[in-house]
């Protein structure tokens, strides 16, 4: 589905099962977009659409709390960790800020605090978030945000950045200090880097953020050292007990500057909301003239004690907010409209544009979402149009400018046949989405289905990337999933740019994937609308592929995360003889699906049946590890303290949760006592 399709649904008239299915689908979609943005640095939707979809999910869950998805983007930050670097757990979770999009919403945030307070104001840098750890004042290691719980250790690359202190400029450093900031590439350096890349026939970067993120993730730090990256610090994370915390956020930033860190020279201390508005007005007008890209402004309660009182949500602090700038818009001309085919056959119109610069990037393509969108906006080939590039990702055509329309402008019509395989295109139930009916007979769908099949959350054949899949399909070496497991060394080495070593790596990766879990297999076969969460639920419920194949509609709709839509899709999938043949061929070549093992919770007198909250950081446990351990012995782990909480497990640097637990008289357990109880 596309963002516009999610927006067009009339959720208030849906049956409960359908509503639940769409909430799950939206949560899965946002998780995937988060992974593409934070982990792969390859977003396919705009920041604006992501923010609107996130808010839509929040609203739906607020109205229907019984349908709240488990482990969704509502509870998490960011994306998962790439392979290739050592994974390090954050000593203190790297959270993100809630967003607002207007001065009215910013005013609401200010008024909710219920204090006439000072706000520290700063630009929101558009780069890569980083945590740098110092021991006794000396650089120890650096970690990316990752999924907020753990990230990639990129110390050697970060040490090459000229303005990163390798030793704190103080005679009395704390024993441990984690400094957080944003790694960026300024506009001029970005243009110079792309010019260099183009001259040397290398792939250029789409924008400064991607250039910064891509540089930090390079394995050769010598190359990174040649790139003029910069670090702008915005705060601290973990700190040892000997660190003397300033009384205000503004003083904290001055302290970091005295330690040798670069901070924004556009920081400002607003004493009231009128000054907040003045700062907003000033920065909005100066944005284009800044040396670096910013995508918004950040406002933080200045008083540190008040920050602690206001507290946190699962996603981040309640005492800070990010104001996001509107998307950048320019004019261009539609030269042509082409139709692309996705994994499920969805037909997406794409405008080919007269190249135009938007935010320092040349744009020549823009999504038109669907044919209904084209009709409602009356967009024609030859029209002058407004193009928006929000958050430096895939542009979209916002509207046409009919006052400039030429007499030969062509109306865009949905083709009756697939542009790739010539199969009939159908529209079911008069929805916005049209689909190619070719299925596995359509090369475009085949290619996208196989890319999905080998992806990390499916069969996880990590050496078989998207480009290689395209090569193999084009060469008629693979058409169905089972064909992947029939590939041989000679076939692979016969392809362009496939040497002996890389070919063997692919074969080893394929062999390694031959014992998938049932949940991975269900996700991999690509049943429409089934994501990770519903795959897990189905695997745990049925316990085997045989039982899943025999599932009846009535049984399916009783399962968590499976509504009528998904249930119908599952039944339809197993009624298709080609799907059955594909799965049987797959099993015939020796794939061994691992059925889930149902583990009975061990009984623990202290924790079984208890509601537990975890706060602070721990010397001997990661937060995720401790959560899983407690759940394995029957505890219910929640994110907030209430009268229903039985105990709070408290580590170092515990904040408002500890305070609230003490106020409510909830039992507090320190790490020193935890091991004995476990």
Swiss-Prot record:
It comes from Francisella tularensis subsp. holarctica (strain OSU18). Coiled coil: none annotated. NAD(+) binds at residues 47-51, 96-97, 122, 145, 182, 300, 324. This is DNA ligase. HAMAP family: DNA_ligase_A (MF_01588). One of its GO terms (biological process) is DNA repair. GO terms for molecular function: DNA binding; DNA ligase (NAD+) activity; metal ion binding. The active site is at residue 124. GO terms for cellular component: cytosol. Residues 602-678 form the BRCT domain. Its cofactor is Mg(2+); Mn(2+). Belongs to the NAD-dependent DNA ligase family. LigA subfamily. PANTHER family: CHROMOSOME TRANSMISSION FIDELITY FACTOR 18, DNA LIGASE. It catalyses: NAD(+) + (deoxyribonucleotide)n-3'-hydroxyl + 5'-phospho-(deoxyribonucleotide)m = (deoxyribonucleotide)n+m + AMP + beta-nicotinamide D-nucleotide. Its EC number is 6.5.1.2. Zn(2+) binds at residues 418, 421, 436, 442.
